[in-house]
Amino acid sequence: MKPYLAVSIQDCGEPLAPINLEGVKLLKPHPYEILGADYQGRSPYVLRTGVLKRLGQARLTLADIEPTWKILVFDAYRPIAVQQFMVDNTFAEIVARDGLQGQSLTTEQRKNIYQQVYQIWAVPSSNPLTPPPHSTGAALDITLLDGSGQPVDMGGEIDELSARSQPNYYQTAQAESDPQREEFKLYQQRRELLNTMMESAGFLRHPGEWWHFSLGDQLWAWQYNQHHPDRQKIAYYGRVE
């Protein structure tokens, strides 16, 4: 079990509300729905009202730094069933990528594949004490749009299963040429901008994903507590249906 799942939850009871903010765009059609995920009539583009308010604050910070840029929301609320769908889908992708036969996987092979899957996907737990971050309505995956409305190149794709997903990958990556070195520097600066604007509103970034931010869930509280051992917090957003 991941350590953040040991954090206690005392849900504050805030409802979910649609993401409808100036300077914040939604990726449509939703990428998981394209893959076949069934949201059963629910929208992935909702957040707890308190989280939504803070996202608006982050957008204002972005406007101060890059006035023409916008936030693009890739994903937000994710029901447990959709979490399970994406875990299964990614498992199948790895099996196909590695040329394996799904019906004849050994126990060790399955274990290895799930280790890769759970690098970017939380376990689709139905236990209310250990909810996936996105099922709380307090986590979202985002990137940036430039002044022409095009996605800003962040040096990696959202949900990418590679070392490039690490937030500070380009800080330590070895460039093979001066132009590539400048390119890596630009990617790192853009990721730092994304983090700066979200942190200014109280969000904290996932340690292994440059695109994932949350506020008030177990992962957020766990990260906060690592840096403030004398001011421990519990999560105030749990699973929401």
Question: Which stretches of residues belong to each language-model region?
Answer:
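Cell-envelope/glycan interface and biosynthesis
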Residues: K2-W211, G216-R239
